[in-house]
Amino acid sequence: MITKKIRVYGIVQGVGFRPTVSRHAAAAGITGSVCNKGPYVEIFAQGEEKCVKDFLEKLENQPPKRAAILKINTEDVKEEEYGKFNDFQIIESEKTKGEIFVSPDIAICEECKKEMYDPKDRRYLHPFINCTCCGPRLTILDALPYDRERTSMKEFPMCPDCASEYEDPATRRYDAQPVCCNDCGPEVYLIGRAERGRAAIIATRKMIHDGGIVAIKGIGGFHLCCDATNEEAVQRLRALKNRPAKPFAVMARDVEAVKQECLVNEVQEVILDGHQKPILLLEKRKKSADSTDLCKSVAPGNPKVGIMLPYAPVQMLLFRYDDGIEMPDYLVMTSGNTSGAPICRDDKEAVEELSQLCDLILSHDRKIRIRADDSVMDFYKGEPYMIRRSRGYAPLPTMVTMPWKGQVLAAGGELKNTFCIGVDGRFYLSPYVGDLEDLRTVKALQETIHRFETLLEVEPEVAACDLHPKYNSTVVAEEQGLPVVKIQHHYAHILSCMAENDRKEQVIGVAFDGTGYGTDGTIWGGELLLADYHGFERMGSIEPFLQIGGDISAKEGWRIAVSLIYQQTQDKEQTMEIVKKLNLCSEPECKVLLAMADRKMNAVTSTSAGRLFDAVSAILGIRTKSTFEGEASMALEFAAEAYEKEIWEIDEPADGESDPDEEKKEPEDRLIMKTGSLIKYLTEKKTEGIQAEKLAYIFHQKLADLIICGCRKIRKKTKCNCVALSGGVFQNRLLLRMVEEGLEKEHFTVLRHHLIPANDGGIALGQAAYAMQYIQEGK
């Protein structure tokens, strides 16, 4: 007989790990115990050597579905040291100091679905059904280790039946912390009305069926919901939210309903119906003109729709109940917030912010501790390509195999904010927080940072933030009472890509996005950097231009277009003539803008690739203004993709001047990608009547050529052969593919993002990685 002490590290809390260990022990015929220590699970395994070996094999090869084992440490111990075990027991959790891995929330499992719709089951139609394999985790946590008394479920004592299941190793709810039923669990209710429980769900379903709008409290916050097949309801929601064109997310009844509206491959289907259930950006099927399914106003002018399946029991009950109401197969399910604010998480916020946007508010009395918006995922070359990393994924750690020691906090960016906590080589990116231009979101950021530091039991040594002095994220970092490390925005993008890909050596970083404060005080956004964790050098950029009009220029691409045209012509009359032909703006507007350009009034020098895309979209007559971030750029991408489907290859050069092997040099010897010549070419061809879609495609192709050429020249100078692609512009899959494939043809190693967003939702990871290196160097 032998006894082993085993410590298992990783995502081992809130995933049914201890019950699984107990079942493996019973199957292997060993005795001992399992205890949740916080940073790890500690197991004592006692029995014949073969039995203990069998147990260890099961532990390694058959962990719970939702667990993630990072390492297992084993040591032999003497029987007299711990005594003889008569059976195998789950020991009450013990608080142990150290880093703890937190499980994300888990979508409802198939077994719970079956029980919920079984009239003979005691949890029939229960809106909060869960087990060890599914249910809320991160969003209900007060503290760790993960036990009921440290979650918001502590307010709901278990009834005798639930307690019996909780204590029985043979059940699926053995040691399931959120376990509850209709008798002892939380309850749904309508705010401001008398209906509770069943009556509240029926009233909500009827309101949606009749064309109304409802706010619904889920796992990580509220959603605004209406019938996605009802044009009038969707248009009303757009008007109330002041959201004229930005796509709404859709929740479909089941996989078959998704397939009716979207093209779904095997990989997408697995993720769609998996345990994380993000919103997937899927290509719409071509429908007949008289189709009465998903209405066009859900995602107007967009070849894709963001769609997901129900992941919370209450969401499933919206589609299927026993009240005889026939519900649609598709519901709009958009974040429950007002513009700029964080997602609402409690009744007070819902009443204050959502009551004017909806007809009913369906809430419940299980408190949400940490907000978690839905994750959003695109696909690139058949692989997941994360756009927003939140529910279901955060805060799973990103591992970097550098010999780092220390603890850091990174406050992230101003838009699409997430923050990151780094512990040695492990980095915990938070759920999506939002845009920090709204002070309510800033408050949410501060609260969530505090809660994460408490949960993970960390005490950061430094706080990292963006270089921009006026960002609210910078202010939050400075308020931490820690040494502050400021990291240039695009450098952080590249480090984020390096960290996700566990790249240790130097890279050529291509950082293309909308805006970022440069080290020279200008706006950057189309950058070629030489970077590693020690620092970076700006090797090149797109051709600088004047961004006139301040923040409004980010919404009105025609302003950038006029500026770029004027930069090429250097002649007011000629510029006004071109602007008139392109119908970019009125003559008085053009005159004012040109005067501002001459005086550099409310104008900044910029190398923003995002604004370049907006300008080209305006020049080609695709979009002159944007009602939401990225609208004009997305429309340009869609136009180019539509043209690509019609042709195999374009071999038409822009002209001699736009040859990517020619380049300008600034006094400091920075490589300048000649985007100005490309603008001149596009302007000329558009005024000649060339198809906008064709020109959109040429723009993508020639911009990719310029990037590839720039990387080639930097390689020649530096011998660096690895390129990292990051920044929100690389959410454009056409440009990403053109650049990646072009670089690979030139025998570069190419790094890109996968499950960390390329946009600003990922830069906190890069900030944290730099801060960790900063600590090692003792700066």
What are these regions, as identified by a protein language model?
Residues 491-512, 516-518, 557-566, 701, ...:
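Glycine-rich phosphate-binding/hydrolytic loop that grips phosphoryl groups
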Residues 178, 185-187, 413-451, 563-720, ...:
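A contiguous, well-structured pocket-lining segment that forms one wall/lid of small-molecule binding clefts
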Residues 62, 165, 323, 327-402, ...:
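Internal gly/pro-rich beta-alpha loop/helix module
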Residues 76, 159, 221-286:
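A phosphate-binding glycine/aspartate-rich beta-alpha loop in the early core of alpha/beta enzymes
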